[in-house]
Amino acid sequence: MRIQGINHLLFSVKCLERSIEFYKKALGAKLLVKGRTTAYFDLQGIWLALNEEPDIPRNEIHQSYTHIAFTVGEEEMEEAYERLAGLGVNILKGRPRDPRDRQSIYFTDPDGHKFEFHCGTLNDRLDYYREAKPHMTFFDD
């Protein structure tokens, strides 16, 4: 078996209507279908699904660094920040960052799922780590 890529992303949400508005306005996702407790979007070719599950505890989600990062052009980072701020999105304080590691904006959806807009690539990150973090071990093919 060979993994061919990510098939879809699904998030459990407390309020489907509130989350639909967030994903449409904050991420520009196109709503494809909405049911009583589920919604499907097209997010720049990514299948994004929401399931309304109002009774699931969500306390621990705020303590985790787990997140999904989307690529945004470096020239669009300020516009992305202003868009999120204008929508009243919860923008998180990012970690201290070396300029070689490029820019990021961290934020949450209404249920606390963390997202990042990042303008760097994996190779940018690896090059930076090779220069700045001698304690790391790299495994090249």
From Swiss-Prot:
Which InterPro entries does the entry link to?
A: Fosfomycin_Res_Enzymes, Glyas_Bleomycin-R_OHBP_Dase, Glyas_Fos-R_dOase_dom, Metallothiol_Trafse_FosB, VOC
Cofactors, names only: Mg(2+)
Where the record annotates domain VOC, the positions are 5-120
Major subcellular location class: cytoplasm
Report the EC code(s) recorded for this entry.
Answer: 2.5.1.-
Q: Where, per UniProt, does this protein localize?
A: Cytoplasm
This protein's UniProt keywords: Antibiotic resistance, Cytoplasm, Magnesium, Metal-binding, Transferase
Keyword Aminoacyl-tRNA synthetase among record annotations: no
Which catalytic residues are annotated? 116
- The record lists Mg(2+) as bound by 8, 67, 116
Q: Name one GO biological process term.
A: response to antibiotic
Q: Which superkingdom?
A: Bacteria
GO CC terms:
cytoplasm
| Quaternary data | Homodimer.
What's this protein's function?
Metallothiol transferase which confers resistance to fosfomycin by catalyzing the addition of a thiol cofactor to fosfomycin. L-cysteine is probably the physiological thiol donor.
- Check the record and name the PANTHER family matching this protein: FOSFOMYCIN RESISTANCE PROTEIN FOSX, LYASE, PUTATIVE-RELATED-RELATED
NCBIfam families with a match to the protein in the record: PRK04101.1 (NF003152)
UniProt-recorded name of the protein: Metallothiol transferase FosB
Question: What organism does the record attribute this protein to?
Answer: Halalkalibacterium halodurans (strain ATCC BAA-125 / DSM 18197 / FERM 7344 / JCM 9153 / C-125) (Bacillus halodurans)
- What phylogenetic lineage does the species belong to? Bacteria, Bacillati, Bacillota, Bacilli, Bacillales
